[in-house]
Regions:
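Hydrophobic face of amphipathic alpha-helices that form TPR/SEL1-like repeat modules
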Residues: 1, 26-33, 62-69, 101-105
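Short helix-capping/linker turns of helical repeat alpha-solenoids
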Residues: 17-20, 33-35, 40, 53-56, ...
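Terminal, low-structured helical/coil segments at or just beyond the last alpha-helical repeat
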Residues: 86-108
Length: 108
C-alpha cells in the first residue's frame, strides 16, 4: 500500500489547528522518521512537546526516546528518564518498559 505522506501531513496540520494532541504527535513522528518531510529531530521534539503538554502519554515516550537515542545531539539519559517517568505515571506501557530496560525503579 502506497502511503500518501503529503495528504497525511495536510490532515494532521488541520488537526493541529484544532489543538488535537494526536495530530501533534503524528506530525512529530513524521519529522522524527523523515516521512514525507526532511528528517528533523528538533521539529519532532517541538510537535511532541505540544502533544505532551496536552497530556499525550505516548508523546512523553517519544520525547524521552529523542533524548535517549541522541537524535538531538549527545544522548541525555537523565532527561530521557524524567520523560519516561512522566509517561509511566500515566500508565503508558512503552514508558514502563523503557524504565525496566534502563533498570530504573518505578512503582505504578
Amino acid at each position: 500500500m502506497k502511503r500518501d505522506y503529503d495528504l497525511a501531513r495536510k490532515y494532521y496540520r488541520l488537526g493541529v489547528l484544532e489543538s488535537d494532541a494526536y495530530c501533534y504527535c503524528q506530525l512529530g513522528v513524521m519529522y522524527a522518521l523523515g516521512q514525507g518531510v526532511k528528517k528533523d529531530a528538533h521539529a519532532a521534539l517541538d510537535y511532541y512537546m505540544q502533544a505532551a503538554e496536552m497530556g499525550d502519554a505516548l508523546c512523553y515516550c517519544n520525547v524521552a526516546w529523542l533524548y535517549e537515542s541522541g537524535e538531538l545531539g549527545k544522548p541525555d539519559l537523565r532527561t530521557a528518564i524524567k520523560w519516561y517517568k512522566k509517561g509511566a505515571i500515566r500508565k503508558e506501557e512503552h514508558a514502563i518498559e523503557a524504565l525496566k530496560r534502563l533498570n530504573v525503579p518505578f512503582e505504578k
